[in-house]
């Protein structure tokens, strides 16, 4: 892995700095950006660029995707919005957004289906 933009005389874009600033230490991000040094998967994990390092990454990624796809799609979307907001907002805005998202989810047909499926020990059947 590497942050190659500097090699080509440009800077990272496509939200690179906006996303990395919350996951990668500033000194590490600066070094890797300024030098375009290649780094290993293990270093990517240590630096905060990767969640885990596994053999058979494609199979693991597909299993993770299936697991997420089996969750309430409205709750997954809400969690994505909250995670994105958490990277840039203060606690009051995040708390307000959590309450607003939860109010939309509670007692929705998909939330009820999630509860029922768990209680009945069966796979849920969500609508989108």
Predicted regions span which residues?
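CoA-thioester-processing core
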Residues: 1-33, 46-47, 60, 64
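Short alpha-helical segment immediately N-terminal to, or the first helix within
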Residues: 32-34, 104-105
């Amino acid at each position: 892995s590497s942050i190659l933009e500097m090699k080509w005389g440009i800077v990272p874009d496509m939200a690179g700095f906006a996303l990395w600033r919350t996951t990668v230490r500033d000194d590490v991000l600066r070094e890797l950006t300024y030098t375009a040094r290649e780094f290993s998967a293990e270093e990517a994990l240590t630096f905060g660029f990767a969640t885990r390092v596994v053999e058979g990454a494609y199979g693991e990624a597909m299993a993770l995707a299936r697991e997420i796809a089996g969750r309430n799609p409205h709750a997954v979307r809400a969690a994505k919005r909250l995670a994105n907001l958490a990277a840039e907002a203060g606690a009051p805005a995040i708390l307000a957004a959590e309450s607003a998202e939860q109010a939309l989810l509670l007692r929705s047909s998909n939330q009820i289906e999630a509860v029922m499926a768990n209680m009945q020990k069966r796979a849920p059947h969500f609508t989108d």
